[in-house]
């Protein structure tokens, strides 16, 4: 399979709490077209528990995935026999869900004699801007989601260098934990963002983690503890207390992330020259305050900011299909014995920063 022909790829995403499928076309010139994108969120199933329950997530994927795939194929007007490839997120993620999606993709590929592409979920986020904006390599990726916060040099398909990572909580995870701590509904990230809009960001003097460091790593656990301590002093919390705590927390995150991105962009330029763009991906990139901060960071270093539409920042099948198409165009396919992976580094050579070997930064 070469890039000199158009490719139609079905993508399947089941790594967490969205069941999704999509069909994309990758044209011979490398441009892309989204033919369908069906996403079914499991928010209602997990809301009573205040977070994602892996067993419930896996069972929900089993219940609806066939219908989601059928809807995606129908909307695209594509028959299975016309597909150039079938792509599925093979990790990282909740292993039960990953198994559901990857096994389904294998079955489709076997029945129709279609190539299988096992996609790294993080690579799919990294390559999405090439579908939406045709961005050229190399670019600097800020990946911010519930499970990951990284700064990555995207040098080509399958060629990634991690410049910075969180040593504890991911940004989306921290937002969700703050929401739960303050009694806000699940999913917590949008609730914190909404409350922050009505709050005073200057009422509380929260720390700005990792500010001024030469590396490009993140840390949010200390900030989370500071919010918990202030909330404990005010219990019971009234609505304005909650708004102000959220505003102060979000302001601290924004300042810290802006500083860390500045360091990451400096490291990128030192190693690879100026990036073609600063790209943001992952669910946290749907936060409008984060988007405003990203525009300021990009303007400061005189680079272009590219952020996919919110529906393509959160988990979706289109990003899996597109990553599959990009890999298929290079002749990269996978065998039927490809294993699902709970952990899967985007940069296979990444190592934990000094003093953080036993933290999340080691993954």
From Swiss-Prot:
Cite the entry's keywords alphabetically.
Acyltransferase, Cytoplasm, Iron, Metal-binding, Transferase, tRNA processing
- What are its E.C. numbers? 2.3.1.234
> What cofactor does this chain's UniProt record say it requires?
Fe(2+)
Reaction catalysed by this enzyme: L-threonylcarbamoyladenylate + adenosine(37) in tRNA = N(6)-L-threonylcarbamoyladenosine(37) in tRNA + AMP + H(+)
Where is substrate bound in this sequence? 143-147, 176, 189, 287
Molecular function (GO) terms listed?
A: iron ion binding; N(6)-L-threonylcarbamoyladenine synthase activity
Which positions bind Fe cation?
121, 125, 315
Which PROSITE patterns does the UniProt record give? Answer: GLYCOPROTEASE
> Any idea where this protein resides?
Cytoplasm
Where would you find the membrane-spanning parts of this chain? none
Q: Which InterPro entries match?
A: ATPase_NBD, Gcp-like_dom, KAE1/TsaD, Peptidase_M22_CS, TsaD
Matching PANTHER family, A to Z? TRNA N6-ADENOSINE THREONYLCARBAMOYLTRANSFERASE, TRNA N6-ADENOSINE THREONYLCARBAMOYLTRANSFERASE, MITOCHONDRIAL
The identity of this protein, by name, is tRNA N6-adenosine threonylcarbamoyltransferase
Q: Which organism is it from?
A: Rhodopseudomonas palustris (strain TIE-1)
What lineage is this protein's organism placed in?
Bacteria, Pseudomonadati, Pseudomonadota, Alphaproteobacteria, Hyphomicrobiales
- What gene is this protein a product of? tsaD
């Amino acid at each position: 399979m070469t890039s000199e022909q158009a490719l139609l790829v079905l993508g399947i995403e089941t790594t967490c709490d969205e069941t999704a499928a999509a069909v994309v076309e990758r044209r011979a010139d490398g441009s892309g077209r989204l033919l369908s994108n069906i996403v079914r969120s499991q928010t209602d199933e997990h809301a009573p528990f205040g977070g994602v329950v892996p067993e419930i997530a896996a069972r929900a994927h089993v219940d609806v995935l066939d219908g989601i795939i059928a809807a995606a194929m129908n909307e695209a007007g594509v028959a299975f026999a016309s597909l150039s490839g079938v792509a599925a997120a093979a990790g990282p993620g909740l292993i039960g869900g990953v198994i559901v999606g990857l096994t389904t993709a294998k079955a489709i590929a076997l029945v129709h004699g279609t190539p299988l592409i096992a996609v790294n979920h993080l690579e799919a986020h990294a390559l999405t801007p090439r579908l939406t904006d045709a961005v050229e390599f190399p670019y600097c990726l800020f990946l911010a989601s519930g499970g990951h916060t990284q700064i990555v040099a995207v040098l080509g398909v399958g060629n990634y260098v991690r410049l910075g990572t969180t040593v504890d909580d991911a940004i989306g995870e921290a937002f969700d934990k703050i929401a739960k701590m303050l009694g806000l509904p699940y999913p917590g990230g949008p609730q914190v963002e909404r409350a922050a809009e009505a709050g005073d960001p200057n009422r509380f003097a929260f720390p700005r983690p990792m500010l001024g460091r030469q590396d490009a790593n993140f840390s949010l656990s200390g900030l989370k503890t500071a919010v918990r301590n202030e909330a404990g002093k005010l219990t019971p919390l009234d609505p304005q207390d909650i708004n102000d705590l959220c505003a102060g927390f979000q302001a601290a995150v924004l300042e810290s992330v802006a500083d860390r991105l500045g360091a990451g962009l400096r490291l990128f330029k030192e190693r690879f020259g100026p990036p073609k763009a600063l790209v943001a991906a992952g669910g946290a990139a749907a936060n409008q305050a984060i988007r405003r901060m990203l525009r300021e960071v990009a303007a400061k270093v005189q680079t272009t900011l590219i952020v996919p539409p919110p529906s393509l920042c959160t988990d979706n099948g289109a990003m899996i299909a597109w990553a599959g198409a990009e890999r298929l165009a290079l002749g990269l396919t996978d065998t039927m014995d490809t294993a699902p992976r709970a952990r899967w580094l985007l940069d296979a050579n990444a190592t934990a920063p000094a003093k953080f070997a036993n933290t999340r930064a080691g993954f």
